[in-house]
């Protein structure tokens, strides 16, 4: 099935995001409380991760293997990423909206973050790892990249304990929409 890319991006630009339910039915969602990854000095990570970063075991790439990142994010016991949603991500990637921010160890995909970039907003859809610390390093390097590119917003959608380790925080839907509007007025490009 071909989805209308413009309509999908327009919905994301209004604060909605796609998820599949337990039966695989795709739907649009929003949240009264939105989770953000800080792009300022509130961003933090464990000291043990600094040692991993200093070892430079991982290299970073964008869209080197976008489909593998999609499947890596979906490959869980319970997942909200259906086959149909992967097809949408692939379509958005072809149109220049969806990206994978990846870490590699040699020729092996270590981890990655799947997201949608609309001007100054990066909407993180999911992340995964194949090698320990792969997704954590991807998070640090993605935040550095977004800062360098002038991004205003890193939307993580829903809070979880893993994101809290990076200083993630919640804001109201009203605050989110104001920040999203500001981000959409910025002219940023992920690549």
From Swiss-Prot:
Under the heading InterPro entries, the entry gives: Acyl_CoA_acyltransferase, Leu/Phe-tRNA_Trfase, Leu/Phe-tRNA_Trfase_C
Q: Name one GO biological process term.
A: protein catabolic process
Q: Which Pfam families match?
A: Leu_Phe_trans (PF03588)
Top EC class, one word: transferase
Its Enzyme Commission number(s) read 2.3.2.6
Q: From what superkingdom does this record's organism come?
A: Bacteria
Q: Which UniProt key words apply to this protein? A: Acyltransferase, Cytoplasm, Transferase
**Recorded GO MF terms:** leucyl-tRNA--protein transferase activity
Q: Where in the cell is it found?
A: Cytoplasm
Q: Which GO terms describe its cellular component?
A: cytoplasm
Q: Known catalysed reaction(s)?
A: N-terminal L-lysyl-[protein] + L-leucyl-tRNA(Leu) = N-terminal L-leucyl-L-lysyl-[protein] + tRNA(Leu) + H(+); N-terminal L-arginyl-[protein] + L-leucyl-tRNA(Leu) = N-terminal L-leucyl-L-arginyl-[protein] + tRNA(Leu) + H(+); L-phenylalanyl-tRNA(Phe) + an N-terminal L-alpha-aminoacyl-[protein] = an N-terminal L-phenylalanyl-L-alpha-aminoacyl-[protein] + tRNA(Phe)
HAMAP family (UniProt xref)? Leu_Phe_trans
Q: What does this protein do?
A: Functions in the N-end rule pathway of protein degradation where it conjugates Leu, Phe and, less efficiently, Met from aminoacyl-tRNAs to the N-termini of proteins containing an N-terminal arginine or lysine.
Similarity section: Belongs to the L/F-transferase family.
Q: What is this protein called?
A: Leucyl/phenylalanyl-tRNA--protein transferase
């Amino acid at each position: 099935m071909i989805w209308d890319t413009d309509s999908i991006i327009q919905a994301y630009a209004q604060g909605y995001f796609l998820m599949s339910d337990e039966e695989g039915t795709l739907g649009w969602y929003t949240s009264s409380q939105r989770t953000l990854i800080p792009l300022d000095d509130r961003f933090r990570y464990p000291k043990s991760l600094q040692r991993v970063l200093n070892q430079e075991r991982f290299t970073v790439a964008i869209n080197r293997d976008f489909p593998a990142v999609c499947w890596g994010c979906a490959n869980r016991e319970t997942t909200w990423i259906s086959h149909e949603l992967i097809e949408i991500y692939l379509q958005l990637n072809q149109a220049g909206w969806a990206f994978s921010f990846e870490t590699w160890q040699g020729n092996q995909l270590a981890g990655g973050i799947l997201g949608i970039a609309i001007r100054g907003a990066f909407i993180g859809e999911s992340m995964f790892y194949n090698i320990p610390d792969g997704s954590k390093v991807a998070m640090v390097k993605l935040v550095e990249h977004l800062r360098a590119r002038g991004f205003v917003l890193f939307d993580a959608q829903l809070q979880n304990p893993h994101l809290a380790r990076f200083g993630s925080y919640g804001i109201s839907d009203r605050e989110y929409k104001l920040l999203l509007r500001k981000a959409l007025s910025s002219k940023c490009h992920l690549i």
